[in-house]
Amino acid sequence: MGWPCRSIIPLLVWCFVTLQAATREQKQPHGFAEDRLFKHLFTGYNRWSRPVPNTSDVVIVKFGLSIAQLIDVDEKNQMMTTNVWLKQEWSDYKLRWNPEDFDNVTSIRVPSEMIWIPDIVLYNNADGEFAVTHMTKAHLFSNGKVKWVPPAIYKSSCSIDVTYFPFDQQNCKMKFGSWTYDKAKIDLENMEHHVDLKDYWESGEWAIINAIGRYNSKKYDCCTEIYPDITFYFVIRRLPLFYTINLIIPCLLISCLTVLVFYLPSDCGEKITLCISVLLSLTVFLLLITEIIPSTSLVIPLIGEYLLFTMIFVTLSIIITVFVLNVHHRSPSTHTMPHWVRSFFLGFIPRWLFMKRPPLLLPAEGTTGQYDPPGTRLSTSRCWLETDVDDKWEEEEEEEEEEEEEEEEEKAYPSRVPSGGSQGTQCHYSCERQAGKASGGPAPQVPLKGEEVGSDQGLTLSPSILRALEGVQYIADHLRAEDADFSVKEDWKYVAMVIDRIFLWMFIIVCLLGTVGLFLPPYLAGMI
């Protein structure tokens, strides 16, 4: 009996100790299990060696990209600034464990500085930060899988095509790959064929049309090895509302002012001033565009071509306006209007331009106007000449000059019989002679002795009356010359108006074609 009892007591003690240990392990917190797991994983772990059992093995890194924000597209410096998350997964055989040994812990987060991570960088970086700067923690799983998603803000170089600016669409890319390891050491695998846009914050200036990832492998000139990379291609389209309101519409309105230059009358004297003002305004807008678009000589933006085209036409309008003003102020004393100018610009062109010159209205009989017809210029003179000549001044001179006049008459007309013809006859003769000159007909001859007109005989005129008639004739000729000059000046002004109207329609057509040419190519390319 003694021996079985002595053998049972040690067995009971062992069971009691085992139960005590099991109870203590169950009462230990979860953090203690992770602490033991950390010690288990990183005791003797070397973060500088590739996580492969054999040197010839390749580490497969699954790579994906998630974009959070398209911060900016700098056309001047040709850079695209993005806020992205780099999704990376690979397998590390040295970081495996049995979850049952560590209180069923299947995954833990560890600082990325403690483990091996692939040196994946952005190849086409534009600001010097090629790698990830914020080292977030990595997610480890019990089967050895490592998942690391660090955020990063990259400035990648992007070739900007401003042909259809501001209705342009850009193709930018981000090229990621290992900087140190070639394809025999690290190979990349595209995690997703498209960029993850689930967490994308919409931009107010650009819209992402498409974003895909593509695997590439390339042999560079520096090395004999082949290096893999995954390139993400972004197709982004500019939202043109801002530039339409602040750039395009003002440009179109200023261009339309060029048309008004040819509708402005030449007498106002502001045609050249308006042309220069429009030219300066277009120059300011062209300077604004040069501040936005990249400094390249490969292509000129569509809006720049439109502004340059308009500036050329404004310059031509200044030249044409100077010519029109020269034509407008021509006169018979400086220029003679050729026959072809009269027939072409006064007869042929106005009919095609729907221009109708108002006819010259002559004043009706019994009415007085500013200018009388040439045949009636002497009407007032005739009335003045038919007044009695026995005025006071003539009576005084008659006594002094009577003897001298009689001697001159006898010498000039020896056969003429002195007659007491009335002064009314002399006035009648002189008026008829002057009227004959004014009407273009022959002046009546001086009647000789024995010839009678009615009951009166032809008599000579006194020198004072002859001088008066010469003054009247001079005034009549001067008024007729003024009428002719005025008519020619009006013809030149009408020629200038016809030239203005020709270029008015030409500029309207050019303005419409330029507007259509501005919007049609982007529309056909599907960018509007």
Swiss-Prot record:
BP-aspect Gene Ontology terms: acetylcholine receptor signaling pathway; membrane depolarization; monoatomic ion transmembrane transport; neuromuscular synaptic transmission; response to nicotine; synaptic transmission, cholinergic
SS bonds (residue pairs): C158-C172, C222-C223
Organism domain of life: Eukaryota
Acidic residues bias (residue ranges): 390-410
Glycan-carrying positions: N54, N104
Annotated Gene3D superfamilies: Neurotransmitter-gated ion-channel ligand-binding domain (2.70.170.10), Neurotransmitter-gated ion-channel transmembrane domain (1.20.58.390)
Species of origin: Gallus gallus
Signal sequence annotation: 1-23
Extracellular side: 24-239
Transmembrane segments: 240-264, 272-290, 306-327, 502-520
UniProt GO MF annotations: acetylcholine-gated monoatomic cation-selective channel activity; transmembrane signaling receptor activity
Entry function: Component of neuronal acetylcholine receptors (nAChRs) that function as pentameric, ligand-gated cation channels with high calcium permeability among other activities. nAChRs are excitatory neurotrasnmitter receptors formed by a collection of nAChR subunits known to mediate synaptic transmission in the nervous system and the neuromuscular junction. Each nAchR subunit confers differential attributes to channel properties, including activation, deactivation and desensitization kinetics, pH sensitivity, cation permeability, and binding to allosteric modulators.
Protein name as it appears in the record: Neuronal acetylcholine receptor subunit alpha-2
CDD domains cross-referenced by the UniProt entry: LGIC_ECD_nAChR_A2, LGIC_TM_nAChR
Subunit structure: Neuronal AChR is composed of two different types of subunits: alpha and non-alpha (beta). CHRNA2/alpha-2 subunit can be combined to CHRNB2/beta-2 or CHRNB4/beta-4 to give rise to functional receptors. Both CHRNA2:CHRNB2 and CHRNA2:CHRNB4 nAChR complexes are heteropentamers with two subtypes: LS (low agonist sensitivity) with a (CHRNA2)3:(CHRNB2/4)2 and HS (high agonist sensitivity) with a (CHRNA2)2:(CHRNB2/4)3 stoichiometries; the subtypes differ in their subunit binding interfaces which are involved in ligand binding.
